[in-house]
């Protein structure tokens, strides 16, 4: 018994114990770790398989960097979807971020909540509390939107949400042409319409 006690004491000294272990330092994992660690009594470990997001490949949003990130095994898991009849039995590339920030780090750091219909559909399938009206307050709680507060945004949360300062003329010309062709343009896909 004394030997077991010594082993246990050695293990606990060398390998710290945690109240919470979060696997994946994407947007959700980082937000959850932040919330849990706000209580000084909680010991929180946040694990991420990929590297830091402090690199020009992630921090400088431009088409070349996005292409590099999509193909990089350092920053991307390289998943492929299973072949489906509707896709001509092709296994499409499914980029998933492998870095601090997760998928937000490899998709131009775009913050998108998901479509209102999806949340309402989950609730209609029996998942009470997952309708859009029920989850929106949680999105608002963490958001600090540079555009300011509105029915769909908060300006006092812990996660900065800002518009890009990168402008790519071909993309802007494409969007302008879509508007001229009669397509509805939307400058806030986390607002009333997506």
Predicted regions and their residues:
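N-terminal redox-cofactor-binding region of secreted/periplasmic oxidoreductases
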Residues: 3, 7-194
